[in-house]
A protein has these predicted regions:
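Short aromatic-centered micro-motifs
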Residues: 217
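Active-site core of metal-dependent hydrolases
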Residues: 10-141, 147-148
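His/Asp/Glu-enriched, well-ordered alpha-helical/loop segment
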Residues: 120-201, 205-207
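Metal-cofactor-binding active-site regions of metalloenzymes
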Residues: 1-13
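Short, small/polar residue-rich loop motifs at catalytic or cofactor-binding pockets
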Residues: 210-212
Length: 227
């Protein structure tokens, strides 16, 4: 696969439509030859063009919508609306945990609210995943586009947002869990060993107590962390 390729973002290298068609075609062919997903992973910025170019590519070429995975789709309400439309075209979207409305991102949609919006709009839960962007850069710009500071995204927000979905937003635990387990495994075509607890799978497990607090972590069947 290829990624992340930034589009609709002032930090992007601004690939043309023809460049993205070529990249997606090569990723798809590489995936077919190697038995892998060949995904093109897209970093979505907040510019108003959003997913326009990707949806145009899907409409005018033979490249299936499932070849693209746009992440940060809850960055703005308009982008989320486009993501919902993209799902109706057969695509899949990735929500970013830890996104909150603030002075620098007033139109940002928290994951729990974004998931509810998607489900209420008829999006199949199987087409939604959630990731943390853990350790990714978190820059702060002034009104003129000058960078003021930069930090790193937390990995902890993924579980925090999952827990909030279940506890405060009445999202059933089996629905919320799919966004961080079987759904990303299927997108990456590693669901023959990841994303579920089944015979022959890798036995990567996070055990929770009755209050949904993490009490143990297993990786390939070995206890690597206990609280």
């Amino acid at each position: 696969g290829v990624g992340e390729i930034a589009i609709s973002d002032h930090r992007s290298s601004h690939p043309t439509e023809e460049e993205l068609i070529r990249i997606a075609s090569q990723a798809r062919m590489g995936g077919l030859l190697s038995g892998k997903a060949g995904i093109v992973h897209l970093h979505m910025g907040d510019y108003e063009s959003g997913l326009d170019m990707i949806m145009d590519i899907v409409k005018k070429t033979a490249i299936p919508s499932s070849q693209f995975i746009p992440t940060h789709i809850n960055r703005t309400s308009r982008l989320l609306d486009q993501g919902i439309e993209f799902c109706r075209m057969g695509g899949r979207i990735d929500l970013t945990a830890g996104f909150e409305e603030n002075e620098n991102s007033p139109d940002c949609i928290p994951t729990w609210r974004a998931l509810n919006i998607c489900l209420d709009s008829g999006v199949d839960i199987d087409n939604i995943s959630m990731s943390s962007d853990g350790n990714g850069s978190v820059p702060v710009f002034d009104e003129y586009g000058n960078i003021q500071s930069i930090g790193a995204a937390s990995c902890q927000v993924l579980f925090g947002d999952l827990k909030r979905m279940i506890e405060k937003c009445n999202i059933p635990i089996d629905i919320g869990l799919r966004t961080v387990t079987i759904n990303p495994a299927r997108i990456l075509r590693i669901d023959n060993r990841k994303g579920a607890i089944r015979t022959g799978y890798d036995a990567d497990c996070v055990l929770l107590d009755e209050n949904l607090n993490i009490c143990a972590v297993f990786a390939r069947g070995k206890n690597v962390l206990t609280f």
